[in-house]
C-alpha cells in the first residue's frame, strides 16, 4: 500500500472516522482524523480507541477541508474523502447488495443522504444488479442540500448545520452527485421532530440502537405511509454511533 508508511487522513463527524481508524489500526497504517468541534464525546472516544491523532475543527465544511489539507501537507498524508471517493462509494454499495441478495423482491430501498457516498453506492448496487428496485434518498429538512441539488442540477450547499442528524450535515461531491442524479428516484425530507420520534420508536420497538442519521429513513416511511403501503421496502440504518444519554426525546 503506497501510503502505509506515511499515513492517511480524513474528516468525519464519526462513522467514517471510526471505520477508517479501525482499518488503519488493523493494517498498522498511521491515521489522522479531523472532527467537528461539536462532535459528541461518545464518537470521539470511539475513534480515539484506534488512533490518538484526532484534530478538532469548526463545525462547517470549509473548516473541515482546510484543516485536513493543512495537516495532510504538514505530515505528507494521503487524503481519503469520506464520501466523494469512488472506492468508498463502491465499498458502501456492498450494504445494499447484501440486502438485495437476501430480499431480491424489494421494490424500494430508503437510504440516508449526507455526503452522498452511501446512497451513491446503494443506487449503483441496485441499478446494476436489481434494476426493478428503486432508491429513495432521505435527508433532514434543515440540511436539504441534496434535495435542492437535484432540483437545480448543480451541487448546492447548506446554510446551517442545525440538525440532530449530525452525520448528514455535509454536502454532495463531484463524484457521487452524477450517480445520484442518474439512479436515485426521489429525495424525501423529514423534520427534526419526525427524526426523534422515529429514533424513539426504533429503540423501543425494534430494540436496536441507531443514531439520528439512520432514523431518518423510518421517519420518511412513516411520513409517507399511505404512498408506500403494501410495498416491499428495505431501510438502510447502518449508523449506531450515538450516546443514548445525550438524546432528548
Task: Outline where the language-model segments fall.
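PLP-dependent amino-acid enzyme catalytic core
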Residues: 1-249
Amino acid at each position: 500500500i503506497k501510503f502505509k508508511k506515511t499515513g492517511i487522513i480524513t474528516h468525519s463527524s464519526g462513522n467514517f472516522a471510526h471505520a477508517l481508524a479501525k482499518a488503519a489500526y488493523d493494517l498498522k497504517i498511521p491515521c489522522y482524523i479531523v472532527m467537528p468541534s461539536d462532535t459528541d464525546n461518545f464518537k470521539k472516544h470511539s475513534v480515539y480507541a484506534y488512533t490518538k491523532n484526532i484534530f478538532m475543527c469548526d463545525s462547517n465544511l470549509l473548516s473541515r477541508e482546510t484543516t485536513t489539507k493543512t495537516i495532510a501537507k504538514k505530515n505528507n498524508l494521503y487524503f481519503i474523502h469520506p464520501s466523494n471517493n469512488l472506492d468508498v462509494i463502491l465499498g458502501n454499495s456492498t450494504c445494499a447488495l447484501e440486502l438485495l441478495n437476501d430480499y431480491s423482491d424489494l421494490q424500494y430501498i430508503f437510504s440516508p443522504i449526507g455526503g452522498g457516498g452511501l446512497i451513491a453506492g446503494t443506487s449503483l448496487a441496485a441499478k446494476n444488479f436489481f434494476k426493478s428496485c428503486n432508491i429513495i434518498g432521505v435527508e433532514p429538512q434543515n440540511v436539504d442540500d441534496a434535495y435542492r441539488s437535484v432540483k437545480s442540477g448543480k451541487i448546492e450547499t447548506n446554510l446551517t448545520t442545525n440538525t440532530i442528524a449530525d452525520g448528514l450535515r455535509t454536502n454532495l461531491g463531484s463524484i457521487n452527485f452524477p450517480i445520484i442524479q442518474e439512479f436515485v428516484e426521489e429525495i424525501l425530507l423529514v423534520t427534526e421532530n419526525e427524526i426523534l420520534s422515529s429514533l424513539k420508536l426504533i429503540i423501543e420497538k425494534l430494540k436496536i440502537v441507531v443514531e439520528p442519521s439512520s432514523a431518518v429513513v423510518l421517519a420518511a416511511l412513516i411520513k409517507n405511509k399511505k404512498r408506500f403501503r403494501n410495498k416491499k421496502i428495505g431501510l438502510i440504518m447502518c449508523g449506531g454511533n450515538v450516546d443514548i444519554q445525550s438524546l432528548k426525546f
